[in-house]
Amino acid sequence: MEKTRSKSKLKTVLIVLGIVVFAIALGIFVFLKQSFLKTFPELEGEPEIGKWYDIPVAGATSSDGSEWHGIFRKGTENKAVIYFFGGGVSITPETSEGGKEFYATSMLAQDFVAQGGVGSSAENNPFKDWSFIVIPYATGDFHAGTGIYEGKKTVYHTGYSNYSAYIEQIKPYVGEPDTLLVTGFSAGGFATSLLADDVIGRFPSAENVTVCVDSSLLLYDGWHDTAVYLWKTPTEISDRLTTDNLVLDSLTALHEKRGSSVKILFDCSYRDDTLMQYQSYIDNGKMDRTKELGDSFQRDLKEMVNGLRTNIPDVGIYIWCSGEDADTHNTQHTIISYNVFDKLGNDRSVGEWIFDAVNNDVKSYGLELLDKAF
């Protein structure tokens, strides 16, 4: 009798434990599906105002050959944000084959990112009622490639092909916007500089155009060759790359072509912890993050800012500090997808600074950080 009772108790305990484990697993799954693994519904018919959608694009691929889609939200205002996501880069055949070590290879978590920062529906977000055309990033080519790398594995550097097909597909839902903000973070910031002129040409009705590059500085003598031979970037884009500074080359060319009709902005934290790691790989073949690398990045950033202000006299600059490490003083990478409305010790947040520029009030903040010493 006692043995029967013991077995019954053990069975009950195991059932309870099983229920608890299942509940925890279910809770984790639900949390992930509502956050990191969130996916939007596919657009069917006319879009509902303020609702996010995934937009399947025929033939579009991520670098690993899996599906790629655009992300879209229709707003109430006749204004549009063209928003390039980031996530690393490939600059050589070796980094192409390295895949996830160097760049995002699939669409994992990209829907979730769209709702943060500048894309949020928060009341204090002046862009909350704009239409958003989001270009996710999973091709390792700064959204600028049309090529397929064939080595030990096949890698699709087809970011430009994806972007251009998606833009043409979604344009009928946007109409003819009178105001355009072209922006992107990290690799998407590099893409913003490379593709802003292309974007502007696709929306000729927009008379008020602002271009903002967030956290994009890497110095590399091989940018032109990478664009031509690895990514297979369209010639009109790769021809602009004549120095080791892709963003400076591209924004300078944009200003020379478009003049004062396009307001150009650049922001970056003054000791960007992620960019310095990639710069270390370019320079030394190894990613690293040290105080010395932070010092070097800070010097490079100062030179970059000086170049922008020389070549584009009316450029707006925002140098900021957030998430500073107590020992190395290295800082957060990118801001527009996250804490873009934090003041960061200035009169205006990065988000407000961008919106001010849209309204023809272009200013600069935080330049004193470029000379901060430790």
Residues of each region from the PLM?
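N-terminal Lys/Arg-rich, disordered targeting/topogenic segments
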Residues: 1-10
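C-terminal His-loop and adjacent cap/lid subdomain of alpha/beta-hydrolase
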Residues: 12-19, 24-183, 190-374
